[in-house]
Every structure is written in C-alpha cells, then in structure tokens.
C-alpha cells in the first residue's frame, strides 16, 4: 500500500527545487560606477550596501576616457544599472559633481527591475 505522506513530501521537495531554480535564473543586476580621481570627495560610498546586485565595478573616467565616451558619461559620479547586460537606469551627479540620487532611490530601481521579471 502506498503512503500518501511520502507523495506529499516528494511533491513539496520538487516544488521547492523548481522555486529555487527559478530564483537562480532570475535577472542579473550589475552596476557600473563612474567617477574621477579629482572628485573622490564626492564618491558614492554606499554602493556596497545595495542588495541583489551581482557585481559593482568602478571606472575612473579621467584615466579611461574611452569608457567615458562609450558610456556617454557627462558628469561624475554616474551610476548605471544594467539588467542582463542592458542599461536600464542611470543616476548622474548635479552641477556640483555630487550624486543627487540616494541609496534608497537606487535600491528602489533595482527592486523594480527584479520585480518586472515576475
């Protein structure tokens, strides 16, 4: 005689496996942080506190003008959020070279991008 409890346990484990697999296949969020050595005082020091970000990279546009041109950086600091390799949001400094966006605003954008998958 079959035990229905075992069927239920196996089914629950299978559903849990599928759920974990779908979470791992979710979109990848990466951030590129652009600034310049002469503007370190206005750097964005809270990027490491953002959640659900796969990688964060830093580029000094004063030392890498090719990146400045490629990503069309007009002021520093600039934060660009990429989802699956495609730019989805950009936050730029104001005229005083200070980042206007807050950590909460950037995190909200990341959360919105991830939720758009569901």
Map each language-model feature to its residues.
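Solvent-exposed, acidic/flexible segments
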Residues: 40, 61, 99-103
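Active-site-proximal beta-strand/loop segments in catalytic clefts of secreted hydrolases
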Residues: 34-36, 61, 94
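Local sequence-structure signature of Cys/Sec-based thiol-disulfide redox active-site neighborhoods
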Residues: 24-57
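Structural micro-motif
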Residues: 71-81
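N-terminal post-signal-peptidase region of extra-cytosolic proteins
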Residues: 61-68
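Bacterial N-terminal signal peptides
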Residues: 10-21
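Non-catalytic, surface beta->alpha helical segment in thiol-disulfide oxidoreductase systems
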Residues: 81-118
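Bacterial N-terminal signal peptides that target proteins for export
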Residues: 1-12
